[in-house]
A protein has these predicted regions:
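PRPP-associated nucleotide enzymes
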Residues: 1-170
Length: 170
């Protein structure tokens, strides 16, 4: 029975289409929150790859991240490049590049390489950068675990050292 009291009718594929349409009607932040709940709830620690590589997240993730930066008082004009700290955060970087482009803004991306401490991507020398990570634990929030702006002396000093050595401003 449904909420209306009637028995559902139609083929099973219609129910799937309805649930997809319900998801599409959500605001972008709500879509991302729904995906996070599906993949993270009940897990004490998650890399978020199941979310960042999901096709539904790919369409909204970049805009949500840029909006989160703006909500924190930053403008897209405050940074020149965005970098991925882990493999799971690479789609986040790509999504931000595409979201910025759709807004008429230029934003480059890069990936941190920890095998040979360096970056992969356009030069970040003299550029202002934001680093992204895609880890979530019960004791953190999405905004603080997935959006990391490095400062001198924090726990990511290796990452900061590589970026600083390449002449970027974090």
């Amino acid at each position: 029975m449904t909420e209306s009291g009637f028995r559902p009718t139609g083929t099973p594929d219609l129910a799937v289409a309805k649930s997809h349409n319900d998801f599409a009607m959500l605001e972008p932040r709500e879509q991302l929150a729904t995906l996070l709940k599906e993949h993270v709830v009940g897990r004490p620690f998650s890399e978020l790859a199941a979310v960042t590589f999901d096709h539904r997240a790919a369409t909204v993730m970049g805009h949500v991240l840029i909006d989160a930066l703006e909500d924190a008082g930053y403008s897209i004009d405050d940074f020149d490049a965005v970098g991925a700290l882990t493999a799971a955060s690479v789609p986040m970087v790509s999504a931000m590049i595409q979201a910025a482009a759709s807004r008429g803004e230029d934003l480059d991306g890069f990936v941190m390489d920890f095998v040979y401490p360096s970056i992969k991507g356009p030069s970040i020398e003299g550029r202002r950068v934001v680093l992204l990570d895609a880890w979530l634990s019960e004791k953190s929030y999405v905004q603080t675990s997935s959006l990391v702006t490095l400062r001198n002396g924090n726990e990511l000093s290796l990452d900061f050292g590589i970026v600083e050595q390449l002449g970027a401003k974090v």
